[in-house]
Structure formats: C-alpha cells, structure tokens
C-alpha cells in the first residue's frame, strides 16, 4: 500500500490534468457534479449521473437556441421590412407636386376605412397626362409597393407590369386603383358599402388633357428622411390595428354593412372572351363579392375561361351581381356616363392569368360573417383572388333554413319583371364584361334543379327556396338579361359549356312566376345535361374539390334531396315521415320474426316504395325525379295510412301469439314446480319417520341421525335452489312467486356442522312452511358436553392408534433398542465398579461418558418425535415405514422363489428389470430404490466380485440417505449386541451419534 499523502497527490495531479485538458481548472470545478471535494477530487456521489446532467444541459441549450432564433427572426423581419420601405422610397422620383397629389389620392381611395363608412368611391375628374410621367413603370412599382391602409396586415408587394405589348403606360396610369387591382387579377371587394360601382368614363382623351384641375400641394421636404420613414412605418402599424378594431366593431353594430348584404347575395361570375374588341359596353363586375370563405374548384374556373376564349362564342347567358343598399330602389335604366366602362382586352387576359397566381388557394373552412379571408394567411385586399361561385349560407346546414328562406325570398320574385326590362337585349353587351369569375356548370345545374317546383299560383312563393340562395331562372340564353331581386342577389344560369343546350330553350319575356311546369322541366334537363363531371355527392362540397366525400356528407345529401319538395305538402310530408319513423322504431326488431312467421305482405310495401324510388332515380334525371316525388307525395298519405294499419295489425297478432306462448310456458313451469315440491315433501316426511324410529336408540345413533338429517336437508335445499334458479331463468318475468322460495328462507343463513363450535346462540332451525310443522333440534341440544366428550374420545382413539403405529416403526424401534442397550451397559459398568475397588481408568471413564451421551441423544430423539415434530412429520415417518415394510416383503418373496445359486451380473440385471416391471404393475412406490438395492444385496452375498464395486459407489453417492443411514445403523448395531462386554461402548457411541441425526434425515 502506498502512503495516503502520495495517493492524494496523485489524485490531485490527475484531476488537474483533466481540467487542463478541457480548458482551465475553474470550468472543471463548475462542470463537476459533486460539491464536496477533497484536494480537488469529488468525494460525494452525485444524485444525477453525468449522462443525465449532460442531457439536461443539452435540452436547456436547445430551448435557449430556439428562443434566440425566434428573437433573431423577429429582428430580421423588422429590419427587412424597414429596408424594403427604404429601397422603395429611394426608387421613387418626384419631379413635381402632381405626383404627390396623385399618390395621396390613390392612398385615400384605396383606404378601406373610407369604404367602411359608406362613403362612395369616386374617380377624380381629371387624370395626369402621360407626358408628365416619363417613368411610368417605376411609378406603378411605387404605387404597388407603398404601405396602403388595407384590411389585412400584409403590404402588397406585386410589381405591376404591362400585360400586353400594345398597351401603353398612360392607359394603365389613367385607370383608377380599382381597375389596376382588377388588372392584377385580384377578386377584390371594391366599395362594398357603397351601392355604385367605380367606373372609368370612355371620354379618356379629354380627361388626360386636363391636368390643371388637380389640387396643387407643396412637397414635403422631409419625405426622404429616415426618421420620417420610421415614423410612417409606426403609424402604418397603428393604422392597421385601429382599422381592424374599427372593422370588428362595425360588424357587430351596423346592420347595413357589406357583410350582412353580401351574405345574402350570390357571387358575380362572367364569361371571358379573350380577343373581344374593347368597344362594347356592359356591366363591369370585376369585384368578386364572396358570401363565405368557401371556394369552388379553381381548375374548373380556369378550364371554363380557356374554353370560352378558344370557342369565341358571342351569345352568353350571364347574371351580374349588383350590391344595392337595403332601402334603395334598383336603377331604372343604365347610365352610359357613370355605370358603364370600357374594359380593354388585356384586363380580362390578366384577370384570367391571375387565377394561377400564388393566392389561388383554399380558404379556411371556418364560417364567418365577413367576406374577407381569415387571417391564417394574411393578405392585402388587392391580393384577394378567392372566387366563390355558390356561397354556402347557414340555412343550408339545417332543414329549417329552407322554410325560413321561403319567407325571406318571397318578395324577390315580385320585382323580376320590372328588373328584366332595364337591361339591353344585345348579346354583344356581355362579351366585354368578362372577368375571371367563370361560373362552373355544377352550381347552375344544381341550383336550377333544386329550385322548388309547385303549382303556378304558389311558384312565386316557392321561388328561392333552395337553401336560402335567391335563385332565379334565366329566360333565354340569347337575350342575356339579368333578373335582380330587392336585395340585389343574382345567380348565373349557364356558362360557356351550357350554351348549346341553352339555345334550344324557348325565349320568353315572362316572369318566373308565370312560367309553366314544362318550361321549368326543360330548363332543368338542359342544365343537367350541361353538368359534365359533377355528381350528386359533390353538391355539399361547395368549397372544396372532393371526389370521394365521407358517408356523413352523402347521408346529409340524401336527406336534403328528400327535403327538396314544395312547401305545399310540408304538413302531410311531416305527418307521413313521423308516422313512418314511429312505426319503424317499434317494428325494426320485429321484421325478422314477421318473415319467419310467413307475413311478407307487411314488409313488401315499404320495400316496394324504396325500390320504386331507386328505379326512378336511375331512369330519369334528377328534375323528373323531383316531379315524380311531388306526384307521389299527393298519394303518399293514403299509402302511409294503409301501411301503418297493416303493420299495426301484424304487431297485434304477434303480441297475442307471444302472450299465448308465454302463458303456456308459465303453466308448464308451475306444474313442474309443484311436482318437485311434492317430491321434496315426501322425502322430508320419510326422513322424519326414520328419525322418530331412531329416537329411542343410543346417543351415538342420535348423533348419526342428526348428521344424516343435516346432509339430507342440505341436499334438499340445494335442489330447491337449483330448481328456483331454473324457473326464474325460464319464466322470464312470469309474475308469480314459486313456493320453493319459501323453503329457502328458513335455512339460508345456517352454517355447516364443522362451524357449530363458533355458534353460541340457540337458533331454532325451523322451516316456515313445512307441512309437518315439527321443529328441528336446537344447537344447544346437538352441541352439548356429552357430544363434546364423544368427539374427544374419537380424537383420543385416533391419537392412540397413530402413537402405537409410531412405536412400531423401525426408527422408534432403533431408538428404544439404543436406550435399552445403553441402560444395560451403564448397569453392568456400575456393577463392575466395586470389584475394581474404585480404581477407574481414563479409558473407562470416557467410555462411560460416551454411553451416557448416546442414551441422552436417544431420549431426546424420542421426545422430539412425540412432542416437537408436527403431525405432518409424524405422518411422513409412518408413510416411510409402510413403504419399507412393503419393500421388505417383496424381497422376502423373491428370496423364497429364486434358487440359491450364484448368478452373473447380466442375469442379475435382467432379473432386476423383471422385478421392476412387476413392481410397476403392482403400483409399489420407490422403484428406483428397489432397483438399486438388489445389486447391493448381491455385493453383500458375493463380496469378492469386483464388478459390483461401481454399483456400491453409486449407491453411496446417489442412493436415498434414509436407506444408507439405515444400513450403517444396522451394521453397527449387530457388533454392539455381540460385543457388549468388551467393545460395545465404541460402537454404541457411534450408533448414538447417527441416531441423533436420524430424525432430521427421516423427516426430509
């Protein structure tokens, strides 16, 4: 061992080297786990291991990295935003005051706060000439990149470039901000609070030549400074927050705002003609006014637009949508100076192209009152390119909404005649009015198909009952009028794909309320033929392109089809549906049993009706199916009543049959129960007679009879309980109480006879309704001192028998023999002592001590067997002795049968095998011992044979310890008996030692 100081120095040197290798000594102390140190060595084992501590430190470091990364990203975003503002302002050039005036005007007119306050957006009377704007492209970049007061947080960053080579910069500059945003392809809500549309007059040259009407404003000398820019950016953020809060408050307070009006209106959608000349005049509906943030598939819109541009069709059926205030009357005639505009070709081209932009995405499916997009992706108002063809109202989601929609839209059809006359009839009027909002044929066909068809007098009230959408029917595809209701809601009737079928319709100038049922059916079929790839299951998915909707959607779709019937039959339909549902609920579980009972005529009526509906839906289009449903519903109350009567009759018959079967089963069970009770009573009477006859006999016979009576009554109780359980299971709410229950009450709480000693109360075992009425013996009579003495006598007899058997075992015989031998030796030793005259040698004294020890050990062994051992150990001694006796008997039988001749080893083994087989047949235990004991006998008989020596070693090593010890004891007892005078003490001492260990060996 080295010195302690040397050990400490070495440990300190190792610690210092480790700390120097990682860095300095102090960080090593800081990173170390233990706080208690001795010369720099940690002496306290840490609670945390080094790996766990490192893991915790890594997790902390990760969290800190994430936090620092977030802060760096925020700072970077702010810096990039400020840098963009700086770069954009540095690009701007301001040669004169008119630029700043124009920029201020554009900023004001693009501010949604002005439009939210119901201020009509107006175009300035004069626009600057192109000569004053030599850098037109740069100016457009500036106006597109300036921080405009939008409704969303994102600043528009699109660069507006000329979309066509023939377009000059002056023409684009002369447009208002609304037309420029429409050119960029955004489906923007322009002035939703104002009833007018922003229009650019066609007298363009005059306005271009009059720049003097602009108000002259002196330029701000600090417009280029950095502090001013930072101040403006802060003000911009504050304005965004204030405008958002203002917009939310306006939504809650004002009922006349744009969101309430637009939620009742449909989407304006026009067809695109790419190469049309810019001269024709039509309604400008470039603003897409969504009802809810739900989007039909944009691919269909793009395909429809491209097909329209390639086909070059001139006659297009289109409705346009005009936002009217709630109390304002619709315009009587179009005003060419204010309500119409010249739409160039590049405007429509760019609007179609902008559908493929990055903002043509699905909106959030959350419902909202406002038509603006959710702030999941914050966008500016100019970037709102979401197109909605058929908005989903809240009344579509509940069947009650249809009835409310009838009351809400009933006055809509009254003004359609006056409104339809105010529109020019030329088919070329609509060619220039081509925006990117191309309507899909699915919406038109579905809206026309699901329009309520009733009697002519009720058609005006039923108009628009299609889930709250104000649906009107176009009169002709070639005339191209629009029909507006009092809320300004209009619906596109057909698109470019539906034109060939719409030409086949008969034009008429009548209102929808005066149309006949056949015209509406023809219009339905034509609209349905135009519906190419849209099936019925896709109707609910108004916002998404779902080819395989979930079963829940299809289930609600079928319920919608069933509810699409005229309100005239509403009461009858509800009555029939309610009655059908009640009967179906009651008889759902009875249909199978009715089929088994050969009553198929009841089920066939409902099945036939379902099959008829399926066949009608397969053979005819949906329009004809609706008409047939209307015809069928006229006769449905009678059929429903007949079906209800037949089902109720069948139900009554089945109920009667079940009652009869139930009563029959109950009668059988009652009879069987009575038979069992009579049999039990007979058995009890017989037992009582037997007990009366045996009452004169001795007490032992009384005890036996009581026990027998107890057993019999217990078995009778078990039988009654089993029969009671069977009767309760088979009777099935029979309503009667079996008399077997009465037998179980008196004996339910009784205990078996081996628990009698724990019962001290004298409970009378009397059964309540026994016919004999005789009370049983009390517990005090059965459990008396005499019976106690008899039980004690039984146990004493058993103990005496077992004690005698123990005394007869070989083990106790050996112990008794040892005690007898040692006592004789001690007596002989004491008798010989006077002859030697008191002179005792040391050898004799030690011999006497050993004999006394052997005697003491034998006496202790006997005492342990009878007073210390458990009963199980004593029984094991008896069991072992019984097995030894059987083996001894077998050996004696073999000796008597086999001749006394010398046998070879092979012959002896074969004989042993035969003996083993015989023992196995007899079922004797300890076969291994018997098989191994025979060679030992052979060795004893023939000690000169050397081949038997390994067998003896096996016996001494693997034989049972009981037999080996027994053999040793026997061999030592024989010389002790023969050599008592001279050498008996030595053998006796050894025998005593083995006998002291003997009980432990025998009880293993």
From Swiss-Prot:
Residues 64-82, 773-813, 901-916 are annotated as: Calmodulin-binding. Residues 994-1004 have a biased composition (Basic residues). GO terms for biological process: centriole replication; centrosome duplication; ciliary basal body organization; negative regulation of cilium assembly; positive regulation of cilium assembly; regulation of cytokinesis. The modification Phosphoserine is found at residues 170, 364, 370, 398, 550. It comes from the Eukaryota. Disruption phenotype: Lethal within a few hours after birth with multiple defects in organogenesis. Mice show an early block in cilia formation and a phenotype reminiscent of human short rib-polydactyly syndrome. GO terms for cellular component: centriole; centrosome; cilium; cytoplasm; microtubule organizing center; protein-containing complex. Residues 253-276 have a biased composition (Basic and acidic residues). This is Centriolar coiled-coil protein of 110 kDa. The lineage of its organism: Eukaryota, Metazoa, Chordata, Craniata, Vertebrata.
């Amino acid at each position: 061992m080295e010195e302690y100081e040397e050990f400490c120095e070495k440990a300190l040197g190792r610690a210092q080297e480790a700390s120097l290798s990682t860095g300095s000594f102090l960080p090593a102390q800081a990173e170390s786990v233990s706080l208690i140190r001795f010369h720099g060595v940690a002496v306290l084992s840490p609670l945390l291991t080094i790996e766990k501590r490192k893991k915790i430190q890594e997790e902390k470091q990760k969290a800190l990295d994430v936090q620092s990364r977030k802060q760096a990203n925020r700072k970077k975003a702010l810096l990039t935003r400020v840098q963009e503002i700086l770069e954009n302002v540095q690009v701007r050039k301001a040669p004169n005051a008119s630029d700043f005036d124009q920029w201020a005007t554009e900023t004001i007119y693009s501010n949604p706060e002005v439009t939210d306050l119901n201020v009509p957006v107006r175009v300035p009377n004069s626009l600057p000439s192109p000569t004053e704007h030599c850098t037109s492209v740069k100016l457009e970049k500036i106006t597109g990149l300036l921080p405009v007061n939008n409704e969303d947080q994102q600043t528009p960053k699109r660069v507006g470039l000329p979309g066509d080579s023939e377009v000059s910069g002056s023409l684009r500059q002369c447009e208002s901000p609304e037309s420029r945003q429409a050119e960029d392809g955004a489906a923007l809500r322009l002035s939703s609070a104002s009833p007018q549309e922003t229009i650019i007059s066609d007298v363009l040259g005059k306005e271009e030549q009059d720049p003097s009407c602009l108000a002259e404003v002196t330029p701000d000398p600090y417009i280029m400074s950095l502090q001013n820019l930072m101040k403006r950016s802060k003000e911009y953020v504050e304005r965004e927050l204030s405008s958002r809060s203002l917009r939310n408050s306006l939504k809650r307070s004002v009922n006349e705002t744009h969101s309430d009006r637009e939620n009742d209106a449909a989407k304006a959608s026009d067809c695109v003609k790419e190469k049309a000349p810019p001269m024709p005049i039509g309604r400008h509906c470039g603003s897409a006014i969504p009802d809810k943030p739900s989007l039909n598939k944009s691919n269909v819109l793009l395909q429809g637009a491209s097909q329209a541009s390639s086909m070059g069709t001139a006659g297009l059926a289109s409705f346009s949508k005009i936002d009217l205030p709630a109390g304002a009357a619709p315009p009587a005639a179009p005003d060419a100076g204010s309500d119409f505009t010249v739409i160039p070709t590049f405007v429509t081209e760019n609007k179609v192209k902008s559908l493929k932009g990055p903002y043509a995405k699905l909106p959030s499916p959350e419902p909202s009152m406002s038509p603006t997009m959710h702030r999941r992706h914050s966008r500016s108002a100019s970037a709102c390119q979401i197109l909605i063809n058929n908005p989903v109202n809240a009344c579509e989601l509940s069947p009650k909404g249809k009835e409310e929609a009838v009351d809400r839209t009933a006055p809509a059809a009254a003004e359609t005649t006056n409104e339809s006359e105010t529109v020019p009839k030329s088919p070329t009027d609509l060619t220039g009015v081509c925006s990117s909002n191309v309507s899909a044929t699915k919406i038109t066909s579905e809206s026309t198909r699901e329009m309520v068809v009733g009697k002519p007098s009720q058609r005006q009230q039923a108009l628009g009952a299609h889930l709250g959408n104000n649906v009107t029917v176009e009169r002709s595809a070639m005339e191209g009028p629009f029909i507006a209701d009092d809320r300004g809601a209009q619906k596109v009737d057909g698109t470019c794909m539906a034109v060939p079928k719409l030409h086949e319709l008969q034009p008429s100038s009548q209102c929808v309320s005066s149309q006949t049922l056949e015209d509406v059916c023809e219009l339905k079929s034509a609209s349905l033929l135009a519906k190419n790839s849209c099936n019925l299951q896709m109707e609910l998915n108004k916002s998404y392109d779902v080819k395989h909707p979930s079963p829940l959607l299809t289930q609600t779709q079928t319920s919608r089809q069933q509810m699409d019937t005229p309100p005239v039959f509403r009461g009858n339909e509800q009555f029939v549906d309610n009655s059908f549902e009640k009967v179906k609920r009651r008889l759902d579980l009875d249909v199978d049993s009715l089929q088994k009972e050969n009553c198929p005529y009841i089920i066939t009526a409902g099945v036939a009706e379902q099959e008829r509906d399926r066949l009608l839906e397969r053979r005819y289009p949906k329009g004809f199916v609706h008409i047939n449903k209307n015809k069928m519903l006229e006769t449905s109350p009678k059929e429903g009543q007949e079906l209800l009567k037949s089902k109720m009759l069948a139900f009554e018959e089945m109920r009667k049959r079940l009652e009869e079967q139930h009563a029959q089963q109950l009668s059988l069970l009652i009879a069987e129960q009575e038979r069992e009770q009579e049999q039990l009573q007979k058995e009890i009477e017989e037992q009582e007679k037997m007990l009366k006859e045996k009452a004169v006999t001795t007490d032992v016979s009384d005890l036996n009879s009581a026990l027998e009576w107890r057993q019999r009554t217990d078995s009778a109780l078990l039988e009654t309980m089993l029969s009671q359980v069977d009767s309760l299971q088979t009777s099935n709410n029979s309503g009667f109480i079996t008399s077997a229950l009465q037998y179980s009450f008196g004996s339910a709480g009784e205990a078996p006879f081996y628990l009698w000693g724990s019962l001290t109360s004298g409970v009378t075992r009397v059964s309540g309704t026994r016919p004999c009425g005789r009370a049983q013996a009390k517990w005090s009579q059965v459990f008396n001192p005499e019976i106690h003495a008899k039980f004690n006598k039984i146990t004493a007899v058993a103990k005496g028998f077992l004690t005698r058997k123990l005394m007869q075992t070989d083990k106790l015989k050996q112990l008794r023999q040892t005690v007898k031998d040692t006592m004789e030796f001690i007596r002989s030793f004491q008798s010989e002592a006077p002859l030697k005259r008191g002179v005792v040698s040391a050898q004799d004294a030690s011999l006497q001590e050993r004999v006394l020890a052997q005697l003491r050990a034998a006496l202790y062994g006997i005492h342990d067997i009878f007073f210390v051992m458990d009963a199980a150990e004593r029984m094991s001694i008896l069991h072992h002795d019984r097995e030894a006796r059987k083996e001894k008997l077998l050996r004696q039988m073999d000796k008597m049968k086999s001749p006394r001749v010398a046998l070879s080893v092979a012959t002896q083994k074969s004989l042993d095998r035969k003996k083993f087989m015989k023992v196995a047949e007899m079922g004797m235990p300890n076969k291994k011992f018997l098989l191994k004991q025979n060679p030992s006998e052979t060795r004893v008989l023939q000690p000169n044979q050397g081949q038997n020596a390994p067998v003896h070693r096996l016996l001494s090593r693997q034989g049972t310890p009981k037999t080996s010890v027994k053999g040793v004891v026997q061999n030592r007892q024989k010389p002790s008996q023969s050599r008592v005078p001279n050498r008996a003490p030595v053998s006796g001492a050894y025998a005593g030692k083995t006998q002291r260990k003997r009980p432990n060996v025998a009880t293993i």
